Structures are given as C-alpha cells and as structure tokens.
C-alpha cells in the first residue's frame, strides 16, 4: 500500500510549475494586499487583520508536497509604510524525485519604511528527494524584515533516515547595493559530513532566522545569545553582520540552529522572533494563530 505522504505515480511523472506574486501597500491607514496573481497550485488566503493595520496572509500550496520536476516561484514586495506577515499552514514535503530536481524560489523586496515577517513552516526532505530551495531578500535602507527557514532531513516521525538524495540551499540577504549574507550549501544524503563533528554531528534539522534593518545591532545579538541553548540535541548561535560603505547601509542578525526535534527547533525560532520583533519593527510580537493549531 502506498504511504499517504508519498506521491501517486501520476504526480511522479507530471510536474507542477506554479507562481504567486504578492504586493502590499499602505492604504487608508492600514496595509492592503494590492496585487495577488497566481498560476498553478499556489494561492493566498483572504487577508486578515488580527493586529489592526498589519496585513496577515497565508500562502497555500494545495498539493502539500513538491515532486521531482516541480517548480514554485513566490514573489513578494512590500511598499513604504506597509507591514505584512506571511506564513504557511503546514510543512512543505519534498518527495522522492526519481532523479529530477524540484525547486522553490522565493523573492522578497522591502522598500524603505516597509516591514515584513516571513514565517513559513518547515521543509521535510524525503529520502531520495532532490530539492533546490532559493531565497533572495532585498531590503532597502529604512526597511526591515524578519524571516526564517527550517529543513528536516528525512521523515523522522516515520523512522526514515535521509540516506540518499540531495539538497541545495541558496540564500542571499542584503540591501539593493550589496549582500550581507550569501549561503550556497549542498547536502548529500551519503556525505560523511552529516555525521562529522565539523558538519551536522548526526543532527538532522537545520534552521536559519535572519533579521535585517536598522534595529539589527550587536547589542541585540548579545542579548539574544544569552538565552540560546548549546547542547547535544539542540544548538544555536547568533551573529551580527554590520553594513559598511555608507551611512545608510543595512545590518542584519543571523541565527543558525541545529537540532534533533522539530518542535524544539520551532519553539526556539518563535522565541527568537518574539524577542526581535519589537526592536526590528517597532511592533510587539503576537504569536500567529496558526502556531496553536
């Protein structure tokens, strides 16, 4: 019997190419979703306003998983004076690919005076999957953004080891003039680095949180670092990457996490976001309703 989380034969032989374009702007004292275009199975739910003028949206991918050959493109822009919060309702599953790469490309642009919280749930990379996850973030001086990504290698809840396959993580975060952080990582299921102390040390979950804007200071990084764990099953560290070259250059905080339990990693990242939101956006943190369901 086919596992309910495994794609049908049809899903493995066909491919989805889907895109979603979202634009946010300040209108009549609150943030409005002024443009939403989609092709294929990517959608966004009707905007909600649990924080008054801040616009909340939930990005939906009805197939719930990404199979070999699929490509998802998400393009987000936040204008000056607007504040958007975007999340996903569940984990993104990357299925066994039968040799074909699957890809997701997220592009984020925040204007001066704009604010964004990009808070998707984790990616679960199945054994034999080939996943390419690309994120490009450009935040103009005076704008701010907080976002994260987490990856679980293998269906750990089902006892599956990630023994074969490949994962590429390509991330760029910066301002219009320069990148403050560029990551180009390649994970191979059979690589000995996954078990090496200098690699993942046998842990199978990795998370990254970035926060870019005027509030990203060394003092904030040090305050956050005091509460981060460093033990065998959950490790985290934070650094401040300061801008340079001009008086308006952006700075960012970068939090990296390794763990063995997704719930623990998730709670750590939510706690960090809770600490960072006020100094980064000037708005107190309010946990998303999605996180309690």
From Swiss-Prot:
Q: Where is the signal peptide?
A: none
Q: Which InterPro entries match?
A: UreD (IPR002669)
| One term of GO molecular function | nickel cation binding
What Gene Ontology terms describe where this protein resides (cellular component)? cytoplasm
Q: Which UniProt keywords apply?
A: Chaperone, Cytoplasm, Nickel insertion
Q: Note the superkingdom of the native organism.
A: Bacteria
Q: Where in the cell is it found?
A: Cytoplasm
The record's section on Pfam families has: UreD (PF01774)
- Can you state the subunit structure given in the record? UreD, UreF and UreG form a complex that acts as a GTP-hydrolysis-dependent molecular chaperone, activating the urease apoprotein by helping to assemble the nickel containing metallocenter of UreC. The UreE protein probably delivers the nickel.
Task: Name the family the entry cites.
Answer: Belongs to the UreD family.
This molecule's function is given as: Required for maturation of urease via the functional incorporation of the urease nickel metallocenter.
Q: What is this protein called?
A: Urease accessory protein UreD
Native organism: Cupriavidus metallidurans (strain ATCC 43123 / DSM 2839 / NBRC 102507 / CH34)
